[in-house]
Amino acid sequence: MTSKILTSNVATVCGWWAGVAGALAVGAGLLESRPPLAVWALAGAAAAAGAGLAARARVLLWAACGLSLTAGCTLLMDVIALLFGQRVDSVTGAVTHALGLVGALLTGAVAMAVTGRRNAAAGAPTGPPGRWIPYLGVLTFLPYVAMKLHWALGGTFAGVSGAEVLAQSERNGASGLWLTLERWGLDATVLMALVGILLLFCLIRPWGLRLPRWLPLTPALIGTATLVPYGLLGLGYLVLAQTGAVGISSGAFRSEDDTLLVAWIGYTAFSGYGVALLAATRWYWRRTRGHGGPTPLRRP
């Protein structure tokens, strides 16, 4: 009975979300001359969610979940910018990203309930999905961390020096905190990567089960919903760019080859870590389901 009430409440909240998201998307489309692509994805997600809720159609609900992920997959970039005192590129875009992430969680939960996958009688897994998971996250991030630290320490990589990277950050309006860290030989994204690696270990190691459930799950869900689609879509685009099917701007780099090299390092890190985080989050979610506080540990 409790499960049915919870599912009904989630569906109700999802319906309200669809209304708010749809209204925002329509408003942005009417008021802005060139609304972000995420706005159109959010509009499609709201429409699919509304139709899916009315018909209890899991295909439409999963489509809404996918479109919501597309709309919200860059939310993490907005969060990082705000954490380091920077302004987001677009307020409309940031709100769209946040609504997209919330919508992905809501529509995904309702879709799972419709398909019967959320079975309260299902037993929780007895052990972590694999102790290799956090090490996968570490390995995929190592080249990225090395590249960013090399620049922060004044080195040159892909034809760009650390001084040029710092100057580019200043031109892009980086915050004082961000620039100060770079001058000290630290890169803000490297610090976030280290926090992310710690989160991976927290999700699958026994000491992580002693924490309140929401504490690791909140950043884990945000990271999973943003990094997995962002990283995988980025890799897909790079494959097309590498084969010449699409073009790629060299940007601050001296050649397209340099741009591709740096992009491969970045998107491999994001996608590899995102997949590892997805597996760890899924296990932690199932292992701690029904526990609002720390989970007691059983000795073998």
Features from the language model and the residues they span:
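Membrane-interfacial, low-structure loops and terminal tails that flank and connect transmembrane helices
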Residues: 1-12, 115-132, 291-300
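An N-terminus-focused feature that recognizes amino-terminal "leader" regions
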Residues: 2-107, 111-115, 281-291
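Membrane-interface helix-boundary signature
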Residues: 8-11, 57-60, 89-92, 96, ...
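Membrane interfacial helix motifs at helix-loop boundaries and amphipathic/re-entrant anchors
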Residues: 26-41, 73-99, 148-187, 233-267
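Transmembrane alpha-helical segments in integral membrane proteins
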Residues: 51, 103-117, 138, 188-207, ...
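Loop-to-transmembrane helix junctions at the membrane interface
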Residues: 53-66, 199-224
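Hydrophobic alpha-helical membrane-insertion segments
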Residues: 63-71, 136-152, 218-236
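Extracellularly exposed regions in secreted/surface proteins, prominently low-complexity, repeat-rich
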Residues: 252-300
